[in-house]
């Protein structure tokens, strides 16, 4: 065997592995990007699309997109389909958390290591061996690993604990709280947090059903007597809890998905069932220290509301809710909320509402995991719906927990405030050419015939219902096109009280509550549908992998026209046309 190329990485989760190295220069969201049953990469925009992760050492710069990646990784580990190891450029708390939960609750291990600036060296090697805190890169298959006892978990490093923390860790508040505290402390050590803080509220994303492992996790905690210590809301779940049977959802999904929701309700969470908790009457407030999972909600809370939350992984969300404590790290700290990248947006003149998700998706691709500040939108003064669409798109194509829009968002009245008085590390300029490229990535179908219009990802707001009702008033959808909107029970009730539901029902629209498009499949996605249309950049990115359909992308008015006429316009919108 030839001499190996040696790297000493930072160990995030201990363990050993040897085998084929699967390298990509692009971050990967495990949720929506990896099938939890087969371990196939299903993100059709990713360079590893179609490859299988099982048994390979996966090398990616980091995660991106969904907080549910930790849940998918747990499914892979407990189902015996996980990668042999994960090698990262930068620490990824979502992936690390999935492996930590596997160790703490189920005694299963998956090594994760961080290589920093040396990550790109992996591109030249097809084989790797991780053992004894060292990574060997090989041109040929390395020797097999020798059997060895499991590595002991470090328990001495971590934050300072107060008396309450110590009582939780000692089991004085129950076994569920003790297990939750162990997980919180392991993540705090990984983050380098010096202490824990009290939190005011939590939003749980782990209620999305990804398979039996996530249900087993929740029911284990519930059966140990788990109870949340702070007001806790639930994300959109995987089914419409009240109507999944009449909607024709198979019991094989409906029953465990409903059971997962019940487990979190039994722990004291509220039945909010929304991926847009910022639309609830009692939402987070500026300056509050909160623990929110669900990527779009995290971005909105930090950026628009001015609350303080990290991009919490599934499972970490409920662990913090059960203890009422979170590591003082990341976006809980002033300095970690400052922008690092400046993105200057050229004046494009008149645009439609599709501008904001297109721009958000592009900014996520450009910012390289660093918090961006967007300059050039002050005169447009985007409203909350526009910022919601922008943030959801940004959170899909990147791992960032927040953004600033100069002159619009609360912590960015000017450039100096957004950057904490420092100069940007990078400055990028965005014009029509780059936006056209992003649009074409989202508007990926060649077909113009539309079978389904999918709205409400993230969940529709009351103002979006009003806009849609105005566009649909006095009209009827094409008989061969379904138009389906997902939203929360609370917002649907507001839309009904305002008279918008009657207008939409006369148009032929269908409403689904409790769940969202990223969790829906057949029959709510019609089995015969080949091409869907959406105004959501998030769903346009994920749908080809999640439901195997072609996707057209447009603003809300374009979606309504497609629902009426049965076809989408070919080519670019006017504000992106080559003639501008």
UniProtKB/Swiss-Prot annotation:
Record-annotated disulphide pairs: none
Result for mutant: residue 457 to A: About half of the catalytic activity of the wild-type. Contains iron
Gene Ontology BP, a term: 4-hydroxyproline catabolic process
Functional pH dependence: Optimum pH is 8-9.5.
Coiled coil location: none
Substitution effect: residue 538 to A: Loss of catalytic activity
Record text on activity regulation: Inhibited by Zn(2+), Cd(2+) and Hg(2+), but not by Co(2+), Ni(2+), Mn(2+), Sr(2+), Mg(2+), or Fe(3+). Inhibited by pyrrole-2-carboxylate and its derivative 2-thiophenecarboxylate, but not by trans-aconitate, fluorocitrate and oxalomalate, which are typical inhibitors of the aconitase enzymes.
Reactions listed under catalytic activity: cis-3-hydroxy-L-proline = 1-pyrroline-2-carboxylate + H2O
Family the entry assigns: Belongs to the AcnX family.
Subunit relationships: Monomer.
Protein name per the record: Cis-3-hydroxy-L-proline dehydratase
Gene: lhpI
